[in-house]
């Protein structure tokens, strides 16, 4: 039995447009689609919904390989079901990253728990962490809790691009549209999905502001650097087709001319310029890290940077901050010069 993911027009506001079905019959996988429907009603972002569907598709394909019947029954679930799933992924070649494994397991666990509330708890020694859970306002005694099953994720330090790498990558662009795209990533710290979601009306050039649609269908208002205003102005005057869609960044050639630029088109653009410049790490998210590092070096506070980057938790912002030994030395030297009192002179 084979399964696949399909996209369909939602017939109502309670049905997810992303479905997992059997390839031969087209019959939906009930427990998965019911979970996707619940998440759709909860108004999660469409990108998150697709990610959940892909993760559950991976899980059901594994389940079918070890349970030929295909359908999941509550009696088939054991305490080690998810541990067996982790072992399977760890034996794959190429092996998925720990973050990918954890994401897949977390979504599968939520969907199974929603569908089979009386199924055995997933217990695997060494894969959980104990913690104390406190009630709101700190009332009552703390209660012991156990984290979900997950593998250890090694800490990653994503090194931002150097000044020389940015200059070399930048010089490879010729189109005003492409320069504007790189500009809003490098000077405003936008995610690639945010860049693609921008509409023409979001660019308030006369006010030097940009209205950015972020995660969770939230908007934030960002100040635009003079260089960004100039880049966007050149693109709007010289290259953006007229008429075209409401999107800010659109395709410039072919049958798709004037329509919103796609994620595949943006990936292709960066892939071409990485090959041209031989800067293998120049991707949209690396530009976001470069923006964060530049802001910290310029003296922007963490709370302000959190707002600029659209984070809801300052711990997430800290993941983008990489302080080098040279940065520490310069900060210390500046603090000593400004705030350290001179030593008193020794009495003779």
Q: PLM ranges: what are they?
A:
Residues 3, 336-348:
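C-terminal secondary-structure termini that scaffold catalytic or DNA-interacting sites
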Residues 188, 193, 197-230:
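Conserved tyrosine-mediated DNA breakage-rejoining catalytic core shared by Y-recombinases
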Residues 159-192, 218, 243:
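Basic, Lys/Arg- and aromatic-enriched nucleic-acid-binding interface segment
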Residues 120-168, 213, 252-257:
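Flexible interdomain linker/hinge and immediately adjacent N-terminus
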Residues 32-48, 56-141:
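N-terminal core-binding DNA-recognition domain of tyrosine recombinases/integrases
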Residues 183, 288-312, 319:
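C-terminal catalytic core of tyrosine-transesterase DNA break-rejoin enzymes
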Residues 309, 314-334:
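Catalytic-site neighborhood detector that most strongly recognizes the C-terminal catalytic loop/helix
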Residues 226-279:
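Active-site/catalytic core of tyrosine-dependent DNA strand-transfer enzymes
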């Amino acid at each position: 039995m084979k399964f696949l993911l399909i996209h369909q027009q939602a017939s109502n506001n309670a049905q997810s447009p992303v479905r997992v079905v059997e390839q031969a019959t087209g019959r939906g996988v009930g427990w998965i689609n019911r979970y996707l429907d619940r998440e759709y009603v909860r108004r999660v972002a469409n990108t998150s919904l697709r990610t959940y569907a892909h993760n559950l598709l991976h899980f059901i394909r594994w389940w079918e390989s070890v349970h030929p019947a295909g359908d999941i029954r509550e009696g088939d679930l054991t305490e080690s079901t998810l541990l067996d799933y982790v072992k399977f992924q760890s034996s794959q070649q190429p092996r998925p990253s720990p973050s990918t494994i954890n994401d897949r397991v977390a979504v599968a666990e939520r969907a199974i728990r929603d569908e089979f509330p009386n199924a055995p708890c997933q217990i695997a020694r060494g894969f959980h962490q104990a913690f104390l859970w406190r009630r709101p306002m700190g009332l009552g005694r703390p209660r012991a809790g156990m984290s979900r099953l997950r593998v250890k994720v090694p800490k990653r330090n994503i090194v931002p691009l150097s000044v020389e790498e940015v200059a070399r990558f930048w010089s490879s662009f010729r189109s005003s549209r492409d320069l504007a795209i790189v500009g809003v990533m490098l000077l405003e710290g936008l995610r690639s999905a945010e860049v693609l979601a921008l509409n023409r009306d979001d660019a308030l050039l006369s006010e030097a502001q940009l209205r950015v649609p972020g995660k969770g269908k939230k908007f934030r208002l960002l100040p635009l650097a003079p260089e960004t205003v100039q880049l966007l102005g050149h693109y709007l005057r010289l290259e953006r087709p007229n008429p075209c869609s409401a999107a800010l960044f659109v395709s410039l050639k072919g049958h798709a001319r004037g329509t919103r630029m796609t994620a595949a088109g943006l990936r292709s653009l960066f892939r071409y310029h990485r090959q041209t410049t031989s800067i293998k790490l120049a991707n949209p998210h690396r530009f976001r890290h470069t923006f964060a590092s530049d802001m910290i070096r310029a003296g922007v506070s963490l709370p302000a940077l959190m707002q600029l980057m659209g984070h809801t938790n300052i711990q997430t912002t800290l993941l983008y901050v990489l302080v080098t030994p040279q940065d520490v030395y310069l900060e210390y030297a500046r603090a000593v010069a400004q705030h350290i009192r001179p030593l008193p002179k020794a009495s003779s």
